[in-house]
Amino acid sequence: MGLQAPFRSGGGTSRPQGRAAPRAVDLRREVHDAARRARVASRVLALLPAVAKDQALRSAADAIAGHAELILSANAEDLETARAAGTPSAMLDRLALDTKRVEGIAAGLRQVAGLPDPVGEVLRGYTLPNGLQLRQQRVPLGVVGMIYEGRPNVTVDAFGLALKSGNAVLLRGSSSATRSNQALVQVLRASLVSEDLPADAVQLLSADDRATVTHLIQARGLVDVVIPRGGANLINAVVRDAQVPTIETGVGNCHVYVHEGADLEVAERVLLNSKTRRPSVCNAAETLLVDAAIAEEALPRLVTALQDAGVTVHGGFARDATEDDLRREYLSMDIAVAVVDGVDAAIAHINEYGTGHTEAIVTTNMAAAQRFTDGVDAAAVMVNASTAFTDGEQFGFGAEIGISTQKLHARGPMGLPELTSTKWIAWGDGQTRPA
């Protein structure tokens, strides 16, 4: 597969100093034109049989693996620029690719190819008394916009899930990953062409200008849904300004509540895994709640375990956690600690400070566990298990495009079914509706 210079979808050139070129108009046109091309491509994908989509995904996986050198070279340039800008180490880790990570990206596409095709799945069907046969089945959403930060792997994950579910995807990544994303999309587009599929099923929008985001999220009628994936500022801005339907994902102020009926050995294990396994992801625990009835015994043990693991504790022994501590999504080796007076107080605290992502209770009291699971408002609730399990692959349905913290159209880890809508189909033999 011959590849040219990295693909760019507009916005990659700077305008000369002192000339008032209508860049804003041009950028809006570029985004809208890309969306129109995506719409055309989406109609092709919507009619593809599962076998063709799976072959295209396997071809893309082979192309990613076969062009690892190109991808890693582009990523090295991004990393060099990021280091020179003083980017924190945690963000550098999100940005970085190596041979193993590229292999993992390719493996992810092959995994998606092996998943059941959601398109055409019949959710319900029945025959009316007049003989009219009704069925409701899954259909693609159409054109999906993805806005995300930092992680080049999201570029390929979004492509794979969109293709499998029959959708075209418009990608707007972070400027910090521009070269990496260009290289990846270049490879993906070439692989689509090699399978006689439209390259415009995946397009990378310019990350050089923040106005790209505005034009994408306001392209009502051209884009069917936008999924922002990143920090709170990004997600809040998209949800606030969008005219296109959005699915809010990712912000996770997750809690581990240690009930008075907890086995403290289990509590320590669950807490440490929830906090330290990958502290920079949205399902990491950010607050520890300890029941007042066992605080004298449990707090020293749990706080010491956290500190021994390298976690900075905000609250606990020396002082109460502040309001800012309790509302913060740290995404680092930090955690807030507070004492609550029983399960109802824990529920009230979480419903006040949580973000509707993942909450956990540790207890041997099943009545308390049931009250907690019923009362907490979250996409996922864990009983005696780590918050880290909120993940599409861990839940057993494969890759995810994000974790929705809203209640419409999807909630929790979003896999292939969540990238579909539904269509009602009626089969008749001449039925008419009475006056």
Swiss-Prot record:
| Single GO BP term | L-proline biosynthetic process
**Highest taxon of the lineage:** Bacteria
Q: Which GO terms describe its molecular function?
A: glutamate-5-semialdehyde dehydrogenase activity; NADP binding
Q: Which pathway or pathways does this protein act in?
A: Amino-acid biosynthesis; L-proline biosynthesis; L-glutamate 5-semialdehyde from L-glutamate: step 2/2
Map out region (Disordered) in residue numbers. 1-24
CDD domains recorded: ALDH_F18-19_ProA-GPR (cd07079)
Write down the Gene3D superfamilies for this protein, in alphabetical order.
Answer: Aldehyde Dehydrogenase, Chain A, domain 1, Aldehyde Dehydrogenase, Chain A, domain 2
Where found, per UniProt? Cytoplasm
Q: Taking the first listed entry, what is the main subcellular location of this protein, grouped into a coarse class?
A: cytoplasm
Enzyme Commission number(s) of this protein: 1.2.1.41
Pull one GO CC term from this UniProt entry.
cytoplasm
Q: Which InterPro entries match?
A: Ald_DH/histidinol_DH, Ald_DH_C, Ald_DH_N, Aldehyde_DH_dom, G-glutamylP_reductase_CS, Glu-5-SA_DH, GPR_dom
**Reaction it catalyzes:** L-glutamate 5-semialdehyde + phosphate + NADP(+) = L-glutamyl 5-phosphate + NADPH + H(+)
Q: Which UniProt keywords apply?
A: Amino-acid biosynthesis, Cytoplasm, NADP, Oxidoreductase, Proline biosynthesis
Family membership noted in the UniProt record: Belongs to the gamma-glutamyl phosphate reductase family.
Looking up PANTHER family in the UniProt record yields: DELTA-1-PYRROLINE-5-CARBOXYLATE SYNTHASE, GLUTAMATE SEMIALDEHYDE DEHYDROGENASE
| Function description | Catalyzes the NADPH-dependent reduction of L-glutamate 5-phosphate into L-glutamate 5-semialdehyde and phosphate. The product spontaneously undergoes cyclization to form 1-pyrroline-5-carboxylate.
Protein name per its UniProtKB record: Gamma-glutamyl phosphate reductase
Species of provenance: Mycolicibacterium paratuberculosis (strain ATCC BAA-968 / K-10) (Mycobacterium paratuberculosis)
The organism's lineage is: Bacteria, Bacillati, Actinomycetota, Actinomycetes, Mycobacteriales
Encoding gene, per UniProt annotation: proA
